[in-house]
Amino acid sequence: MCIRDRPYLAEKICRSLASKIKKRFKKIDLILAPAMGGIVIGYEIGRILKKETIFCERVNGKFTLRRGFNIRKGMNVLIIEDVITTGKSSLECVKLIRDSKAKLLGFASLIDRSSKQTLKIKKRIISQLKISVPTYKKRKLPKNLISIPVTKPGSRFIK
């Protein structure tokens, strides 16, 4: 089951996450969501908090602001994703914020499945659910997992 195709569930879950966000961040000027997974979640939380919300999307493999979106100098920006695993997409968003001379407030996601081994983000992540998922180097994969095909969700390599 996926909440992105069930708006009635997305609203409920995002309302709960929005409540956590409101307690942690007092002055949010803008929500930035990376495409694809963050768009619906970012929009829904922006709607609930009544905050301007934009998204960035990949152009030639690099996150870019398009469609007339911009981050103004001095804005307090919160990055919202559906799932944070390594933090790579979030860190690409951070670059857009810094290049605009705006301020990064932090990160929020429905699911935080990052670990100390994979996380590249230094700020705290607010999430609805924290999941501990072991990660393995290819050569150290347990035998019981070797026969299971690897899948890689996300949009990083979509052309």
State what each model feature region is.
Residues 94-159:
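PRPP-dependent phosphoribosyltransferase catalytic core
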Residues 1-27, 156-159:
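Active-site-facing substrate-recognition patch
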Residues 26-35:
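Short glycine-rich phosphate-binding loop at a beta-alpha junction
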Residues 36, 41-78, 88, 143:
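Short, glycine/charge-rich flexible loops or terminal/linker lids adjacent to PRPP-binding catalytic cores
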Residues 3, 79-80:
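Hydrophobic Val/Ile/Leu positions in short beta-strands of Rossmann-like dinucleotide-binding domains
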Residues 29, 75, 105:
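Conserved acidic residues
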Residues 83-94:
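Acidic, divalent-metal-coordinating active-site segment for phosphoryl/phosphodiester hydrolysis
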